[in-house]
């Protein structure tokens, strides 16, 4: 059962939401457009606001549902974390798109809302505050990722816990997936959200 749920979590995470929206609405391959990501920000940049909103919600749902399925069948924290990792792995490295997917932000958010709603919504709050001030999605995502392990530590009070471990892994993964954005940020070349679709 555990292996089955992990497999389901991966395939759930690998559903190419953004790619499908790009193909059906604009006949474009998001992997070859903009940042090359299939996540909501690249959908916003190349497809539109409402498609990006729906992609974001669905991608959040992928991480949330994967963990909720695991929680339904077990109360083991480690297994919940493994299901979340599987969903995130599917989102970043989807089998359907030859391993080229998103950047783990929305699916990771869904996972943490399921693991600890306080941490999930606190991270979302940090993202929205930075976005309101900077108007830069990548900077907001990176900032939320940096704070994530600290928020988790404050919540559970231990570094020797699967939740803290996954918060650290996801933090590093999100920052690594944004490495090209970081280079553009340092050069002052990163697009602001109000520059998108102009």
From Swiss-Prot:
Biological pathway: Lipid metabolism; phospholipid metabolism
GO cellular component labels: plasma membrane
Annotated localization: Cell inner membrane
Catalytic activity as recorded in UniProt: an acyl phosphate + sn-glycerol 3-phosphate = a 1-acyl-sn-glycero-3-phosphate + phosphate
Membrane topology qualifier: Multi-pass membrane protein
InterPro entries, sorted: G3P_acylTferase_PlsY (IPR003811)
Residues passing through the membrane, by range: 1-21, 50-70, 77-97, 111-131, 136-156, 157-177
Entry EC number(s): 2.3.1.275
SMART domains: G3P_acyltransf (SM01207)
GO biological process assignments: phospholipid biosynthetic process
UniProt-listed Pfam families: G3P_acyltransf
Domain of life the protein comes from: Bacteria
MF terms in GO: acyl-phosphate glycerol-3-phosphate acyltransferase activity
Keywords: Cell inner membrane, Cell membrane, Lipid biosynthesis, Lipid metabolism, Membrane, Phospholipid biosynthesis, Phospholipid metabolism, Transferase, Transmembrane, Transmembrane helix
Subunit structure comment from the entry: Probably interacts with PlsX.
Recorded family membership: Belongs to the PlsY family.
Task of the protein: Catalyzes the transfer of an acyl group from acyl-phosphate (acyl-PO(4)) to glycerol-3-phosphate (G3P) to form lysophosphatidic acid (LPA). This enzyme utilizes acyl-phosphate as fatty acyl donor, but not acyl-CoA or acyl-ACP.
Protein name: Glycerol-3-phosphate acyltransferase
